[in-house]
Amino acid sequence: MMKQKNPSRVRICIFFVLFVGSICRASLVSDLESFKEEVQSSLNAMQEKGFFPGATLGIVLKDGTELAFASGWSDVEKKIPMIPAGRMFAGSAGKTFVAAVAMQLVQEGKLDLDKKVSEYLGQESWFSRLPNHKDLTIRMIMTHTGGLPRYVFKENFTKRLNESPDKVWEPEELLAFVFDDPPAHSAGQGWSYSDTDYIVLGIILEKITGTDFYSELERRILKPFALEHTSPSNTRKLKGLVTGYTGDRTPPFNLPGKVPVDGIYPVNPQFEWCGGGLITTSLDMARWSKILYEGKAFSKDQLDEMLQPMDFRSGQPGDQGYGLGVMVFKRPFGLIYGHGGMFPGYETQMSYFPKWGVAVTIQVNADSLSGKLKGSLNGFIGRLVPILEKYFAE
C-alpha cells in the first residue's frame, strides 16, 4: 500500500522546483543579453576603428538560438545604416554548398571520390586540354590538390568579362582560359586553391543528376533547410544586395570602386557559378554552417570524410588544412570548421566551433582591394573567441 504524502511537503517541493527553474531561466536570459551586448560592442568597436564600412554578423548557439547583428553603413556616402538582413555575395564560401551536394551523391552511391575525373568527363572533346587531366580524381578537385590553375584572375578572362558584362558563361568557356596551361603542381603532390576545380565539379554534378546545379541545390539544400535568404547570384540585378566597396578600376577586375551602380552590378556575377555563386545573409550562412558541420545534410561517415584536411602546403593529410570543401583550423581552444569567400566589394567568413556547438558568420561590404577593409575576417572572428569562451566554455 502506498504511503500517503504530506500535502504541505508536496507544495513546498513544487514551489522549490518552480523557484529554481525561474532563477535558471532568468540567469540564461541575463547571460544571453550580456553576450549580445558584448558581441555588438566588439563589432561596433571594429567598425569605429575603420576596419570595415559595414558588417553583419550571424550567430547560432548550441541550442539553436539565432542572433543577428549589424554595424556601420550599408552605403557610406548616403549614410544608410547596415541592417542584419542585408544580403551580400558569399564568394567562395558558396563552395560549401557544392561540396554538400557532392557528398549527398557520394552517400547515394552516384559519385566516387577516388574515381578519376576522366571516368565522368573523359568523352568531352575539351577534356584532354585540362592540365593533369589523366591523373585528376574527384577527391583532388574537391581538396584543391589536383594542380588546376585558376581561371578567374587571368587577364584575358577579366578583360572579356568587362567587355561583355551581360554575358552568360558556359562552364566549358570558363575552363577554356586554362586549357593547355602548365599545372600548378603534379596531381596530388601539392595544394593550390583554384575555383577551376569547382567548375569541373559542377559539370560532373550536373551530368550525374541530369539537372542544372541551382535546381538541384534548391531541391536538396535550400528548400529542405529553409535557407530562404540564400539564392543564386546569376544576374546583374540582385534583390537586397547592399552597397559594396572594391578597388576603383583596380586589377584584376577593373570595376568601379562602389558597386552595384544604379542597382546593377557592373558585370554578370553568374561566371562564379560553382566556385561560389550565391547571395546570402550572415545569419543564413551561420544556419548553414551549423546544419553542415553537425551532420544534418548527410551521414556521419560522409561528414567525417569531408572534415579530413589536406595540408595547405604539401597537399598531404594533416591535422589542419583543406578538406572536401571545408577549411579546418587547429587552435589552442579547439578546431574551427568553415570557409572564407570574396567577391568584388564583399567578403564572408563562416566558422563553426565544434567545442561549443556555435556557428558564426561575418560579412562585410568591402574587399581587400578597396583599402576600406583593414585586417582579415579570420582576425575579426578571432576577436569574438574570448567572448565565446567566457559564455560557453564548460
Locate the predicted segments by residue.
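Bacterial N-terminal signal peptides that target proteins for export
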Residues: 3-13
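Bacterial N-terminal signal peptides
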Residues: 13-22
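Short active-site loop at a secondary-structure junction
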Residues: 48-54, 78-140, 185-196, 273-276, ...
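Short, surface-exposed loop or secondary-structure junction motifs
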Residues: 73-75, 128-340
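Short, well-ordered beta-strand elements
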Residues: 339, 348-370
